[in-house]
Amino acid sequence: MVTPLKLLNNRYRIIETLGRGGFGETFLAQDTHMPSARKCVIKHLKPVLENPEIPSWLRERFHREAATLEELGENHPQIPQLYAYFSEGEDFYLVQEWIPGLTLTQAHAQKGNFSSTAVEELLLGILPVLEFIHQRRIIHRDIKPDNIILREADGKPILIDFGIIKETMGTLVNPDGRSAYSVALGTPGYMASEQAAGRPVFSSDLYSLGLTAIFLLTGKTPQYLTSDSRTGEILWRQGAPQVSPTLAKVIDQAVRYHPRERFNSATAMAQTLQGNFSNVPMTKGDRPGNTVANGKTKSNHQPTAPTLVVGTPYNANDTQATKVYTQEFTGYTETQEGSPLMKWVVMPLVVLLVIGGGMAAGFWVTSQRRNNPPPAVEEPTEETPIPLPSLEPRPNLFETPSPIPTPATPSPEPTPSPSPSPETTSSPTEDTITPMEPEPSLDEPAPIPEPKPSPSPTISPQPSPTISIPVTPAPVPKPSPSPTPKPTVPPQISPTPQPSNTVPVIPPPENPSAETEPNLPAPPVGEKPIDPEQN
């Protein structure tokens, strides 16, 4: 028990008690080691121990949290500075800057309900402070009218009484030195549902700030506000009919029941309140606050409402938990996300890459075609002489002058005496006459595959006249069109067999192949030699 006028740490003299809470007491004291004997605030913190001996990990954690408070106070003018910290026996002490001024609770008691303009100025003055601590992954967890002081010197809102040390001191320590659970602190009514469950998020601070603004506008604490039984949303506008639409919209979103429906950052809330999306300075807190009554007043730093303690599991061996009260800051997003400048820079680059890739692929394909030209078309042309079998009936044309050899099928080879190959070109009709009997000659092409060496000249079928050899059907390529008349020949040959009845005479040897083909009708005329015999 600390008594007034007692020196703490042989240096700080207690002037009066400012308040008591679940975690200890708050005193107003003087620093006797300073020439000015400046006033300071001393927080006496009592850990929850079941063992009289303080475990070493708790001392280390208290040291880390004190270092965090020191860093915050030194880098932001709207957060009290930490002068010192020490421990005596089983208790811990923090020595902080004294802020002359009024808490929002005291200011409301003096002035009554705030106007919309005054509340907007207050929010724009405190939101940069919240953004500052949230960027360092710290959650205040106990924002309420008692923990915001309007500084007497300039009227700026000062954020006090961070919950980080309270959470450390609220850790229950078992007799074996281990922690049974940690506490989730906050003030009933100002505490969001997820914070009451021991899982505070950054928007939990915005929820508490929204309820603080409602208190300043209506004079009602959260316990006296009605809510929608279906959605859980707070119904407060009927108590502040003169509130501006913009401010009302901002407060409504800040106090949404579900964290995902609130602002994802203090910056977003400030920008919406200002009605634009310009960047709001988050570290200077240069917005003028609501000026309070003239004259020097002292600020009571103790909370007027009790702080709720909720047990949540905690691992005492987690030496990395410098800020165990914080969580991963996933809700914060930069306002310059998706800058149009980046789109104009990235899109042309993507288009150029696509075009360049297409051109490179085209060059590669053409180079491959040049290096590996497709096979020459000559091969299919060489195969074109397929009509050779249809040309083979040509040798039968030469045999036509002597249809008698038809019975002597084995002697077709000597018959190709027709040296007058040129005549073959002029008598396609005659060809049609004789093929009647050459049908068996179709069997001959199989034994006459000797022309196989000749397919090379077949590429140019015109030189047919050069082929005088009976075996080589070189002239065959020229009459390539003749194969079509072949099917028509059989019906025309039917009249020819009549003269063949008189043909059995010896004339074949008398009339060698020297006779011209145009005299093919000679067989019927052959009766003339018969006349002399009759004579």
UniProtKB/Swiss-Prot annotation:
Catalytic residues, chain numbering: 142
Reactions that this protein is recorded to catalyse: L-seryl-[protein] + ATP = O-phospho-L-seryl-[protein] + ADP + H(+); L-threonyl-[protein] + ATP = O-phospho-L-threonyl-[protein] + ADP + H(+)
A Gene Ontology molecular function term of the record: protein serine/threonine kinase activity
Region (Disordered): 371-535
Origin superkingdom: Bacteria
Entry EC no(s): 2.7.11.1
UniProt biased composition (Pro residues): 402-421, 446-464, 472-498
CDD domains attached to this UniProt entry: STKc_PknB_like
Keyword tags: ATP-binding, Kinase, Nucleotide-binding, Serine/threonine-protein kinase, Transferase
SUPFAM superfamilies recorded: Protein kinase-like (PK-like)
Keyword Acetylation: no
Name the UniProt record assigns to this protein: Serine/threonine-protein kinase C
Species, as recorded: Synechocystis sp. (strain ATCC 27184 / PCC 6803 / Kazusa)
